[in-house]
Amino acid sequence: MAVYTDVAADELADFLKAYEIGDLLSYKGIAEGVENSNFLLHTTRGHFILTLYEKRVAADDLPYFLSLMAHLAARGVSCPQPATNRAGEVCGTLSGRPAVIINFLEGVWPRRPNLAHCAGVGEAMAKMHRAGLDYPSYRSNPLSVTGWRPLFNIAASRADEIQPGLRDFIAAELDYLEGNWPDQLPTGVIHADLFPDNVFFIGDKLSGLIDFPFSCNDILAYDVAICLNAWCFEPDLSFNVTKARALLNAYQRERALSEAEQAALPLLARGAAMRFLLTRLVDFLDVPAGALVRPKDPLEYVRKLRFQQNVAGIRDYGVEAAGAVA
């Protein structure tokens, strides 16, 4: 979450008149994250989250993930629900941006994920994948393998400002990924951004998944790969195989990975690292002046990518090919 677009109090109060969520008492911007403008609202009826969708979310895509949240919730997946205005719409316009209000989920995201957190997200992700199998809408992933080179082209001329040799490193890896990306693995609805700050816990118990704007239809195991990179590295960027084992075993208790998915997981993890390396690189080089946002370090994902390049197989993640503990 972040704030790119400021909202005046009187403008917000007028916007909220279309909703039955009470009168506005206070609001504040949420600085965490990098993608959209988010505000915590305090009204006479409680707390809500207001999101203004920015650069990477098209207005035409909003119905996909707003309906998805309702679909998942009806099948037992804990996630926020959008508020409907008096016209029966879940999406309005505020400050020239598509705007949505969702209910506030209790819990906090884990700053230092432990084994219980990793197992919790693995289990919840698998349940989400199963619950999404009958979701009728379809949205391709604009940030999958075909979307990476256009991102690289935006930042290539300045990549070496971040680290000498980074441009050639990315170019070579892109060539490899584009030439080897799998196209026969099981697909379905994925979250595509299931980082710790998008998963809430109360203690060690998972209380909900949030932030669905990148949800789409893609390779299910790619979502798992994203989580391996996001949850299983320590602050010094060493890989914690015990956390990976906890995540993968919990996932597979709900949805077993096929042999082909298991064999492809290191490649998918390389691709997942490339995706976030590139979006971070573009964002790092193009933060709007005065934006209440903390750009994330692209070099974190350079190091994660280098690690994944040396993974020989799923055993390096702490599990046997059949899914048993190594």
UniProtKB/Swiss-Prot annotation:
Its EC number is 2.7.1.39. Pathway: Amino-acid biosynthesis; L-threonine biosynthesis; L-threonine from L-aspartate: step 4/5. It catalyses: L-homoserine + ATP = O-phospho-L-homoserine + ADP + H(+). One of its GO terms (molecular function) is homoserine kinase activity. Pfam families: APH (PF01636). Belongs to the pseudomonas-type ThrB family. This is Homoserine kinase. It comes from Rhodopseudomonas palustris (strain BisB5).
